[in-house]
Curated annotation (Swiss-Prot):
GO cellular component term, pick one: plastid membrane
GO biological process, one term: carotenoid biosynthetic process
Locations listed in the record: Plastid, Chloroplast; Plastid, Chromoplast; Membrane
Organism from which the protein derives: Oryza sativa subsp. indica
Protein name: 15-cis-phytoene desaturase, chloroplastic/chromoplastic
Record PANTHER family: 15-CIS-PHYTOENE DESATURASE, CHLOROPLASTIC_CHROMOPLASTIC (PTHR42923:SF45), PROTOPORPHYRINOGEN OXIDASE (PTHR42923)
Recorded effect of pH on activity: Optimum pH is 6.0.
Length: 578
């Protein structure tokens, strides 16, 4: 349920006056979002577009008034005794308890998204010196965010932290920032397309253990599926429950739609449940998504009592999550450098990495090298000498999926919303939330700010922000029939931001699993991190963090080999006395 942006972006451009929907004067700043930009400058540059409406010559600012909106966060669930949390904690302790190196490795890491930050954090915990290079001037990669001239933040995606994310939950605890997660009630809330303005809930009772709490939530909901449909759905899932992980992995070759047909699951289950799940998990529809992705999510949600419980971060991710990691890394002697874009991976005669060459002419040398960028960036920079190696050749199957994140500030407080994530079940929108209610930093008692994931976005990522906002407003008119009209005759837009990501998380289509690489590459001293690499949480924030831990583990395990390589390299550079 993570939207994202690539870990390299330039926001440049000019401003121009125009009008929104032919009505109001506006101001727009923009950036290129063409795929050609990816090819020419080794990064995906995606559009960040904003609209600011002027009122009597003064820019819109928040004004507090009498209206009071009550937000209720829930206590942090007891996750510490779950098997997955304990396993994740054990992996974290591997780094803290490992033998401190006599000579720390200098490890150069490209990309300061969650994967790169995680790699750096755990290498520093093990006593090594990470040098983390980020191409842009902002941390976070797919969880990056920016502050506009009004002081409002806009993000690359609507990021949800689940109870079933054990490595992320451990990370928050290790950094001492558990209080930055705002836990919501244990429910999943779906809009009802045939009943505009109405919602259907799956409420998970606290008194029941897993999987009974999830089964109870499904059985109690009679608005989305009939009893015969529930029975057929359950029978279809039975092999997954009995067959376990082996069965789940075997379904990688089927799309969700193909699996449903094979298992005799009614089409309405797809319409009522799987479309929303597919778009939330990977921004694509069930006719493209691998069934393995759905089964992994269902397994996590149903096997852990608090697995599907959701939390929002209490503010913008770069400051509230990424900076604590950076501070931790620096406190242990590591470095984090922004505006450090890699232009080329230079090789030694034996095919190993000599150094990373940056666009500013700098050469960064280390004892080991990690690429923690999105897979599309890596594929552009793989040296020609490596391209025929099977490990790298398989990466061609892995392609980032486009997604768009939309933020709209309205002139009033919308009433038909919740302090929670909402599944729109719209053909154009995936999930959304009123961030003025769900997030402390964005709280506003007088005006709503809706953050929405626009997906699937392949046909829309090249369109103008005006078209995207107009289409979004048409969908919102169905979700808020009494409060929003497509022509703005009801709630008025004060401003908006549109963030386009032509290449986000890797597209989890059938038969991708064999192409996902291990973190340790066949090139000595070169490693990968990223949610596309081999780990059990697929394309997610949890997957990114776990991949970083696994990458760091590989480096630590290779310490002796890497030390010998570095010593040999130094000796070869020493001139021989004549």
């Amino acid at each position: 349920m993570d939207t994202g942006c690539l870990s390299s972006m330039n926001i440049t451009g000019t401003s121009q006056a125009r009008s929104f929907a032919g009505q109001l004067p506006t101001h727009r700043c923009f950036a290129s979002s063409s795929i050609q930009a990816l090819k020419s400058s080794q990064h995906v540059s995606f559009g960040v577009k904003s609209l600011v409406l002027r009122n009597k010559g003064k820019r819109f600012r928040r004004r507090l008034g009498a209206l009071q909106v009550v937000c209720q966060d829930f206590p942090r669930p007891p996750l510490e005794n779950t098997i997955n949390f304990l396993e994740a904690g054990q992996l974290s302790s591997f780094f803290r308890n490992s033998e401190q190196p006599t000579k720390p490795l200098q490890v150069v890491i490209a990309g300061a998204g969650l994967a790169g930050l995680s790699t750096a954090k755990y290498l520093a915990d093990a006593g090594h010196k990470p040098i983390l290079l980020e191409a842009r001037d902002v941390l976070g990669g797919k969880i990056a965010a920016w502050k506009d001239e009004d002081g409002d933040w806009y993000e690359t995606g609507l990021h949800i932290f689940f109870g079933a994310y054990p490595n992320i939950q451990n990370l928050f605890g290790e950094l001492g920032i558990n209080d930055r997660l705002q836990w919501k009630e244990h429910s999943m809330i779906f809009a009802m397309p045939n009943k505009p303005g109405e919602f259907s809930r799956f409420d998970f009772p606290e008194t029941l253990p897993a999987p009974l709490n999830g089964i109870w939530a499904i059985l109690r909901n009679n608005e989305m599926l009939t009893w015969p449909e529930k029975v057929k759905f359950a029978l279809g899932l039975l092999p997954a429950m009995v067959g376990g992980q082996a069965y789940v992995e075997a379904q990688d070759g089927f799309t969700v739609s193909e699996w449903m047909k094979k298992q005799g699951v009614p089409d309405r289950v797809n319409d009522e449940v799987f479309i929303a799940m597919s778009k939330a998990l990977n921004f694509i529809n069930p006719d493209e998504l691998s069934m393995q992705c759905i089964l992994i999510a269902l397994n996590r949600f149903l096997q852990e009592k608090h697995g599907s419980k959701m939390a929002f971060l209490d503010g913008n991710p770069p400051e509230r999550l990424c900076m604590p990691i950076v501070d931790h890394v620096r406190s242990l002697g590591g470095e984090v450098r922004l505006n450090s874009r890699i232009q080329k991976i230079e090789l030694n005669p034996d095919g190993t990495v000599k150094h990373f060459a940056l666009t500013d002419g700098t050469q960064i040398t280390g004892d080991a090298y990690v690429f923690a960028t999105p897979v599309d960036i890596l594929k552009l920079l793989v040296p020609q000498e490596w391209k025929e190696i099977s490990y790298f050749k398989k990466l061609e199957k892995l392609v980032g999926v486009p997604v768009i994140n939309v933020h709209i500030w309205f002139d009033r407080k919308l009433k038909n919303t919740y302090d929670h994530l909402l599944f729109s079940r719209s053909s154009l929108l995936s999930v959304y939330a009123d961030m003025s209610v769900t997030c402390k930093e964005y709280y506003d008692p007088n005006r709503s700010m809706l953050e929405l994931v626009f997906a699937p976005a392949e046909e829309w990522v090249g369109r103008s922000d005006t078209e995207i906002i107009e289409a979004t407003m048409q969908e919102l008119a169905k979700l808020f029939p009494d409060e929003i009209a497509a022509d703005q005759s009801k709630a008025k837009i004060l401003k908006y931001h549109v963030v386009k990501t032509p290449r986000s998380v890797y597209k989890t289509i059938p038969d991708c699993e064999p192409c996902r690489p291990l973190q340790r590459s066949p090139i000595e001293g070169f490693y990968l991190a990223g949610d596309y690499t081999k780990q059990k949480y697929l394309a997610s924030m949890e997957g990114a963090v776990l991949s970083g831990k696994l990458c760091a583990q590989s480096v630590v395990e290779d310490y002796k080999m890497l030390s010998r390589r570095s010593l040999k390299s130094l000796q070869s550079e020493v001139p021989v006395a004549s």
